[in-house]
């Protein structure tokens, strides 16, 4: 059990670093590099399917059942979906990424025993976009 926990912690730390790179590239206006990091993020989790094309319920089932991801990993995917929305052109695809991100974050927030200010801020920001 210790080896599995250690692997999971290292994977979460690596994914967290990738998310920071995505944010940094997006803020610098380096959209191509940010999109490359997003693809790398999904590759690290062995997600070959296009999550952008999935319906919300289908996405959740895919992440939980098919990929057997935990809430921490799902939360990171929600953060990446939000960034994909930020990088998308204004329109329906932007809102679709934001909807998926909000839905996943809301699910994690409901099920989590830990309060996360970062999660609450992301939920509030997404709610602003969606209203």
Regions found by a protein language model. Give the residues of each.
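N-terminal alpha-helical interaction modules that lie
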Residues: 1-71, 102-107, 125-131
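TPR repeat positional signature
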Residues: 11, 18, 74, 78-81, ...
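Short coil/turn connectors between adjacent alpha-helices in alpha-solenoid helical repeat scaffolds
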Residues: 25-32, 85-97
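Amphipathic alpha-helical binding modules
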Residues: 90-131
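Mid-chain, well-packed structural core segment of small domains
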Residues: 68-93
């Amino acid at each position: 059990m210790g080896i599995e926990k250690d692997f999971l912690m290292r994977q979460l730390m690596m994914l967290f670093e990738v998310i920071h790179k995505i944010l940094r590239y997006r803020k610098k206006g380096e959209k191509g590099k940010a999109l490359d990091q997003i693809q790398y993020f999904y590759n690290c989790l062995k997600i070959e399917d296009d999550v952008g094309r999935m319906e919300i319920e289908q996405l959740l089932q895919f992440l939980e059942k098919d990929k057997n991801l935990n809430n921490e990993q799902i939360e990171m995917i929600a953060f990446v979906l939000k960034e994909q929305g930020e990088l998308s052109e204004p329109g329906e695809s932007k809102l679709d990424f934001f909807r998926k991100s909000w839905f996943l974050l809301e699910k994690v927030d409901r099920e989590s025993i830990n309060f996360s200010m970062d999660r609450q801020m992301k939920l509030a920001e997404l709610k602003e976009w969606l209203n």
